[in-house]
């Protein structure tokens, strides 16, 4: 799922949090050879972490579809020309701040779009899905999905990444996503009985799954 999450001022705040000595060799967190070639930060400033956590919790779409319960903002990534990240599944143990908490979904938020290549892609049940994210746009995906970043051919790609826990399963979130989209379509005519019914069903499912 892709969603516009940060505005220009918020993007600037995130970029301002990148220090002079922030980045290290990204291979430190991925022990397998030839998996990635990028730079990865040693952490995220507290003010940036709080900003992103609040944005995740406040996003209506994310709340309706994923019902996040705990959000962890972990690190920045940077990709210059020639950098890439091959297909992989996230390695939680490489990040001590995760405290062995179980996470259900990952997110990657782009902080720049003045680059070429660098598309994020996922291996799903229906095939490979890829997209070049706009600045401020987030990709949200089940943590079990193998994912990667195509080689950057020009410019600098910067993003911030994290995970969150959820009260609903992947199958349930797919159903909630469909209900949300129906709601959005029918909300242009709030007198439509189907709209009211869809909202009630969605709220009921969230309540039942949260027990």
Where are these regions (language model features)?
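Catalytic core of non-heme Fe(II) oxygenases with the double-stranded beta-helix
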Residues: 61-177
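Non-heme Fe(II)/2-oxoglutarate
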Residues: 1-70, 75, 175-211
């Amino acid at each position: 799922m892709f969603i516009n999450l940060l505005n220009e001022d918020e993007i600037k705040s995130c970029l301002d949090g990148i220090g002079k000595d922030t980045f290290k060799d990204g291979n430190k967190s991925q022990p397998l050879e030839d998996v990635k070639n990028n730079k990865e930060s040693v952490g995220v400033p507290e003010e940036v972490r709080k900003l992103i956590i609040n944005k995740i919790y406040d996003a209506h779409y994310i709340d309706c579809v994923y019902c996040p319960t705990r959000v962890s903002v972990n690190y920045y990534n940077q990709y210059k020309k020639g950098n890439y990240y091959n297909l992989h599944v996230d390695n939680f143990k490489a990040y001590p701040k995760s405290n062995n908490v179980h996470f259900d979904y990952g997110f990657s938020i782009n902080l720049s779009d003045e680059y070429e290549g660098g598309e994020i892609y996922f291996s799903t049940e229906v095939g490979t899905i890829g997209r070049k994210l706009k600045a401020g746009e987030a990709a949200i995906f089940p943590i079990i999905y193998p994912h990667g970043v195509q080689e950057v051919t020009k410019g600098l790609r910067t993003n911030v990444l994290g995970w969150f826990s959820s009260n609903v399963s992947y199958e349930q979130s797919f159903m909630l996503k469909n209900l949300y989209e129906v709601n959005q379509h029918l909300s242009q005519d709030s007198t439509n009985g189907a709209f009211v019914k869809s909202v009630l069903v969605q709220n009921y499912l969230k309540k039942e799954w949260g027990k």
